[in-house]
């Protein structure tokens, strides 16, 4: 296993244990080594989101969409980060995209209704 993979796993384990702050440290190191890995960007975005670092979470989810434009979760997560910053109209657009990419997902549909 590579050092990057070990850092990624360490970050995911910290997230699973509710230690998002610790996760950011490992995941930032992993990202510096492999910035084009969508899985690292997603995990780091989640860690930033859980530590209420909304602009950083937004940046990671945008980067994730650059790498995987049809990723429904990336659109949903970006919408959540945008919503936390009061950017409801832009957030709603990403919720709609997420919902169109994964029709029938209750979480995605509920966010659209909430921002209606």
Locations of regions flagged by a protein language model:
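Helix-start (N-cap) detector for alpha-helical repeat units in TPR-like alpha-solenoids
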Residues: 4, 38-39, 72-73, 106-107
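TPR/TPR-like (Sel1-like) alpha-helical repeat modules
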Residues: 83-107, 113-116
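TPR-adjacent "capping" and linker segments in tetratricopeptide-repeat scaffold/adaptor proteins
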Residues: 1-6, 29
């Amino acid at each position: 296993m590579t050092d990057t993979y070990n850092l990624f796993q360490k970050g995911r384990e910290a997230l699973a244990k509710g230690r998002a702050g610790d996760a950011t440290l490992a995941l930032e190191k992993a990202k510096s080594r492999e910035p084009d890995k969508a899985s690292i960007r997603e995990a780091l975005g989640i860690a930033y989101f859980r530590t209420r670092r909304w602009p950083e979470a937004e940046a990671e989810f945008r980067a994730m969409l650059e790498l995987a434009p049809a990723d429904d979760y990336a659109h949903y997560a970006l919408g959540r980060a945008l919503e936390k910053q009061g950017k409801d109209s832009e957030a709603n657009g990403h919720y709609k995209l997420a919902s169109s990419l994964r029709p029938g997902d209750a979480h995605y549909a509920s966010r659209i209704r909430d921002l209606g």
